[in-house]
């Protein structure tokens, strides 16, 4: 309107003069023109103003989209296992950890004997471990409950091999030398129990020759020549011997012999999963995640033997060809809860009755079991 008044004043304002009809018409035309011009000018200014105003919601959303999502921190957990079936069951989990796709950040230690990590397990430097069932009971008793059992991961894996044909029953072992491993652990106590149940004195009727590792026993059989050699070996060492020496046979399946004596509701429990008690109290979700991933790994191993065998070789546990033969006979599993407790208690009771030292002097109490 200021612009309109200036134009009118400049063109038509003359003091003391009258306005003609023509001039009045001209003024009306100019007035309309100026009004239209002003309207266009105001609309343009408004549009410019809108272009410079940002929607605060849009800006905030944009800021959120550009912000980095914080990385999820995985818990570092050290896991130990023995070089054998107890490690074979977790090879897919080991591969997932290597590829950084596991739920936790796992570090694995594969050992020849449980002695290599038992002290660290009690201290908590090793959080989880797979080891012989009776060794777990012994550690629990001697450490005043500093470890607990989570589940059974391996059932019977022992076989008595014979390069000849003289052994058909346990009683036929009388007067023989038996090569084996695991002095003071499951193999020794299982063998002694079978011998005693057959009426043989393990200390006088047979000679039990212990070697530090199963590979040494396999070497004795490989170098036997024409001499008959008898040995008790776990898988996959038994499979190795059978592959290298076609004339060697499985004379006795230790699990079958055990069940003949105790019924099918009692079986050999070779390996178990245990956890440091303090770690379990403070990290239950991490332990649950481990068990879920371990179960998945066991299912993979049992249903994809070729792929699992290759992973066994990749992690320097055994050659793939040996693992392929052994896995179907390894009884790899994961049994938890009440079923786990029932099987472990029955197995340990047999060992404890035969020799209390086999389980650390006494049966472990109910606190041993995570249910």
Locate the predicted segments by residue.
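Conserved C-terminal helix/tail region of periplasmic/extracytoplasmic solute-binding proteins
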Residues: 345-371
